[in-house]
Amino acid sequence: MRIPLVLALALASAFAVLPSLASAGVPCGICNSTVPLCVTLVGAAGDAPAAEFGEFVVIMRDLANNPIAGAMVVIDLSNAPDMHFCADQMDPTMTVDCANNRVSKVTAADGSVHFTLLGGSNGAGNASTLLNGGMIFANGVLLQYPTVAAYDLDGSGGVGANDVSALLGDFGLGQPFGRCDYDCSGKVGANDLSLWLKAYGSGTMTRSCGSSCP
């Protein structure tokens, strides 16, 4: 089958710009970059975020697989009304934009940036966001729609009995609410309860947000 001349020229032009895009450091979230499918909001104990249960890394690479240093990586919860960030993320390198329910950090020389996100949800019976409710951007390019979970499901008093009540309530509804999908399986089940109990038993999330983003 012959390729029409116009289409052939268009394809040639597209491939011709790939090297220049790569050298310009254009993020490639669907090929070379490392971006999580799921992220989990955690609490803190004193001034120590529970990194063990929530830390993740984003690694930015361009089309030539080169690391992109100085890229602005944004975690956006504006499409997840039942989830919130803490106004204080206990991370001096993180910028918090409460008005738009998002946070951001800048990648290091190797293209990586580490996040431990402090935040929670809005209590039993109030879940509304299903899977893939968050957004991750780098330099304005949308890279991923991650599922967003939270251990502090009522957003008050640290991780405790009210939170497990909310988890069981979400499970009983049979809906894949993202806030309880701790194992990133796409559903709420027994393993999520096990992971919640492990987080609770660790004693690392005794503190909720002092002030929450709207």
Regions found by a protein language model. Give the residues of each.
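Positively charged n-region of N-terminal signal peptides that target proteins for export
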Residues: 1-4
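Bacterial N-terminal signal peptides
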Residues: 6-17
